[in-house]
Curated annotation (Swiss-Prot):
CDD domains: AGPR_1_C, AGPR_1_N. The lineage of its organism: Bacteria, Bacillati, Cyanobacteriota, Cyanophyceae, Synechococcales. It is an enzyme of class 1 (oxidoreductase). GO terms for biological process: L-arginine biosynthetic process. This is N-acetyl-gamma-glutamyl-phosphate reductase. Catalyzes the NADPH-dependent reduction of N-acetyl-5-glutamyl phosphate to yield N-acetyl-L-glutamate 5-semialdehyde. It is found in: Cytoplasm. It comes from Synechocystis sp. (strain ATCC 27184 / PCC 6803 / Kazusa). GO terms for molecular function: N-acetyl-gamma-glutamyl-phosphate reductase activity; NAD binding; NADP+ binding. Keywords: Amino-acid biosynthesis, Arginine biosynthesis, Cytoplasm, NADP, Oxidoreductase. The keyword rRNA-binding does not apply. Its EC number is 1.2.1.38.
Amino acid sequence: MGNEKARVGIIGASGYGGIQLVRLLLEHPQVELTYLAGHSSAGKPYSDLYPHLTHRVNLTIEPIDLEAIASRCDAVFLGLPNGLACDMAPALLAKGCKVLDLSADYRFRNLNTYTEWYKKDRQDQATNNQAVYGLPELYRDAIRDAQLIGCPGCYPTASLLALSPLLKQGFIVPETAIIDAKSGTSGGGREAKVNMLLAEAEGSLGAYGVAKHRHTPEIEQIASDLAGTELRVQFTPHLIPMVRGILATVYATLRDPGLVRDDLITIYSAFYRASPFVKILPHGVYPQTKWAWGTNLCYIGIEVDPRTGRVIVLSAIDNLVKGQAGQAVQCLNLMMGWEESLGLPQLAFYP
């Protein structure tokens, strides 16, 4: 595209993921934000939804008009509830737009798995076959050549970055993998929910979606690819009383009980040597969610328990940035041939 900025639109910009996209794209040196679209909020100035942006964003949320969007955008982010993107992506792709879907619609190669977990029948297998899973640390080259990206969920991002070196190189017994993950309340979105009320969430910690969370098959699909065999993982998410961040703690049995922590730190550092957003911590240092706030970083700490023969990997991300909007922009950078880290923050809000 030469020195011209890419024209980018967002369909579904009213939620927390949407405003993260708006923030990142407004500050991106190669992007012009040209279209914000939505259903219930159509006709409203974007600053009506987020008044602190009154002096920065002068766009009005427009109706979802695929013809207009395609004529005004080179790339489109779909920040819609599950089950809607698959009705829009084929038309946008046919009109030449690059599409990055933040919902679950294009994360699964097997649409029967999607239907089983998300309860929507699909008739777009041909379009689905074009989709690339948007985890750059694993699929960087495929993302560069893609027109359609299925952006990963927040829990799968944190979990898979923790697990990938172990599975890819066969260091663990795959079926022993257990993922214990904790997320802030922004992961539940902006709509009012009783369990997200301050009076309900403050001072409380609880699990949800036990043995049935929708991110489970997403994790299993990629983990199976890495391991070279179909596998199941035990995944349990928890809600904690903070706004943003995910900490995933992964446990697995080592094939070689002689592996020590320093060996694994070296292995992880080599695995992610070309990944600018993954930071492997030195021995004895374990990540905290606040370190990643507002950034596209993933911090990983590693430990081995010689008594049990298990490895323990801790992964911390910002669920709204590396777990959602930031990772989507990272994919856009690759699709457009730009520097992968362009326009993405690497310094946290601290404290």
